[in-house]
Design a protein with these regions (language model features):
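Short helix/turn-capping signatures at newly exposed starts of structured segments
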Residues: 17-166, 170, 174-240
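Sec-dependent bacterial lipoprotein signal peptides
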Residues: 1-14
Length: 240
């Protein structure tokens, strides 16, 4: 943060501090109040194909701004995709554990959300995990959520599934639910990407090496089970 070099008496500088603190406190109060109001119209429920909280296919960026307010909605935001793509969309709850990004079918007018990305802000620009991050509140009715361990995801699917090896743009993405509970055939409305734990034991490091690369692996693979990846991001497709 840029600091101003002020030449003033210590007593004058001290006298200015309570006002500044009060302004900061009031600013936080306004933001907190606005977000509390927004949460009254957002249940953080994911229904693949239908909605993600208040976001539906019929929604526009302008409508979200009216509904949730500028404290929650970042309009015309840069959204980074695979292979270096940069797209323009909308971000909700930017730089928080509830961060959500929206890409539209009509990208010019930002209408008709097509893809909704649940991407919690949990690491800094260098990839270092942020301390004391609260769990994201987004969840499906089946309980699928960010941070869910591989084994629990298997249990909720009802059987093992396939996922891509780690270490590349699509690494950790579920490629086939293998006829389980989350299998919707060719119409995939919920895509899930898993990632290895932030800290690894020597055995887990060896396991990661064996399940990396652009090949597919079963979740029941012994090395995959030892590695114990968790759900890192989710992508929801909304139907017209």
């Amino acid at each position: 943060m840029r600091r101003l070099a002020l030449a003033c008496l210590p007593i004058l500088l001290w006298a200015c501090q309570p006002k500044k603190a009060a302004e900061q406190t009031n600013g936080r109060s306004v933001v907190d109040s606005a977000r509390t109001k927004a949460e009254s119209v957002n249940d953080f429920q994911i229904v693949p194909g239908l909605r993600v909280g208040p976001v539906r296919y019929s929604t526009s960026e302008a409508e979200l701004l009216r509904l949730l307010g500028p404290e929650v909605v970042t309009v015309g935001d840069s959204i980074y995709g695979a292979e270096g793509d940069v797209l323009i969309g909308t971000t909700l709850y930017k730089d928080t554990a509830d961060q959500l990004q929206i890409l539209y079918q009509d990208s010019a007018q930002r209408q008709h959300p097509e893809l909704v990305l649940i991407r919690p802000y949990v690491v800094d620009a260098d990839g270092t995990p942020l301390p004391d991050v609260k769990p994201t509140r987004w969840s499906t009715a089946d309980g699928v959520r960010i941070g869910m361990p591989l084994r629990e995801l298997e249990q909720r699917n009802g059987k093992p599934f396939r996922l891509w090896g780690f270490g590349w743009d699509y690494g950790g993405s579920v490629s086939n639910w293998q006829g389980g509970r989350f299998d919707m055939g060719t119409q995939t409305m919920l895509s899930v990407m898993l990632a290895p734990p932030s800290t690894l034991s020597p055995a887990q490091t060896r396991a990661l090496d064996s399940v990396s690369g652009d090949g597919e692996f079963m979740s029941s693979n012994q090395a995959m089970q030892l590695l114990g990846p968790v759900v890192q991001t989710m992508q929801v497709t909304l139907k017209p």
